């Protein structure tokens, strides 16, 4: 690097953006800072768009954060080498982001709002340290009023990630949005606004609201207005502002449209501060803030279990880590929408943000799409699970982190409970019980409207110590055999499966013979998609279904996990190459595994499910036993191979924790012998009437490329994404399930190649190079919209089989 480049700190070719802000006393301005320059560990500066994950480009390498540890949570007692535990990507190191902001007139107030920065961010404004936050997952605010001046202002954020600080892939950098808020000296404190529904009676919602005005003067008052989704308005009286700047309002909203997963109605809340409201012109507007929320009630009790809007329901939830697969940790609205849509179509109605604070963008998506949320905070407290984890900060920062979590997110109707921890080692101790009481109490002070929980993986110890007894919602992680003996000892009268299943599978992989096993591993680093393999501490989905169905006092579950994530490649923690999980109901690319349809058959009550497995293309297995399963909500089915019946069977209820319990939720033909041709299942309803069928055919040679997009057009904002599933089909249109061809991607027009993923946990191919091999016949390529209207074109070429013609897809990009 030459000297000139070293000195190019804030030149226009390097800095992220130049913008003009004018902040009069009456004007509030909020600008998203999305264009920055970035350098890692002293490397050359490059321009990047924020949100940005500095590590996702790779390359994969087992030396990144190579950990030699015993994973106590998994029951390990001896340390072994864990090569892919945190994703095998280069997230460790120091990074620096810089941008500039032009200000014409100095505002009375200015703050930088970070939705998360990985990690230990230190913020500088015009060379002066303005703020710091320890926890990379939390939102925080930096008051920079005194550091700004007229003209160009330099903003710098320095971050540091250290080794052995995470049990999964954390990402690195400014991976969530950064905003600059400017307002007058007198302004509404955004996080002070709090709207909660106290009760709903005969269609009338009783709502309380509050807020605080910084720099309030005696001649000022406030007003609040609730605007319904149908255009209805409910206005407050003129609100007095106390000496402490606080104001309070109550509303009676008639014909309230309540928020729920089935009907996610949202209200706009407009808050205004007025000076001299009795003046000749009706007063002067000092500040105004608009937010969205929903009206709904949440409660838990011995009598009703979990209730939303007064109606008892069992949570059908999944755990989701924060990474977005090939996008890494960098948050993206289109990617989040796709995740939530996949889970809702499966029938899920809740997610758990394991094991950390969620992004604001994710909560907004859950609000608008109707997905309940358990918003989690910590994976550890005082005692570390990894050498340099959050335990370093807990004593000093825990209360501040809980405060920011709750204040930042308490107006999101999707959040139905807070979680203060996951599998905390202190759960056996009096110290742990006291910390639970303290953190739960803080949540109650900041938000009395929601219950608090945490996930406990040592139920006997947690109950004995009182750790589980003091929680609003006792949550057990796995150990379904511990539910019955511990439930009578819990004073709450109900129990949540805060983390369940941990069944492992690889999409499109089937192992023979089929075994039910808690320790199965194979030389290829894959797991069987017959969904009969799990971990030593966990279980199969069927056991959780049985517990939810047969125990009235269970209030639901959160499955580990809804989608595969980077890092934690159990059961191949010691295997290389393996760098992402096998737990997902969907793979890392977001493609449903067979298990998706098992959950769908139990959870999606709006649509029927008929799903056959495995695929029916097995050259070399002719005449060999190849079991066939069907996942369906129907109770009975008959299977045919080339027209020959393999038997008509019904689901049966089993009471024991053994293989027979599978037959309660699955239809299984275990003695089918493979022969090429047609596999067909015919399903019957409870009255024995034929209700539907599904057919699989043996695939021939690949004849063409099939492209299936998850949407028909994109928004020209430079951020929107389309996910295109790429597969090979034969001349009859049958997918070739074993295809592993190398596919190449070219994007032209108003869009660009973003990333690609095939869901193979053992693949070391780059996510950001425009080519990748199919994994078991499929992959997903992601294309990003440009900033101008027009058309984008995706061209996919099979580099392995030149006889297959390239496939082309076009898509409109609209403003």
Language-model features and meaning:
Residues 26-113, 165, 171-174, 186, ...:
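Extended carbohydrate-recognition surfaces in non-catalytic/accessory domains of CAZymes
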Residues 32-35, 51-53, 59-61, 66, ...:
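An acidic-aromatic loop/edge-strand motif
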Residues 144, 249-258, 667-673, 768-787:
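Short, hydrophobic beta-strand segments
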Residues 149-152, 210-301, 669, 675-676, ...:
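Extended acidic/polar, glycine-enriched regions
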Residues 209-212, 272, 628-632, 682-683, ...:
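Beta-strand-rich structural segments
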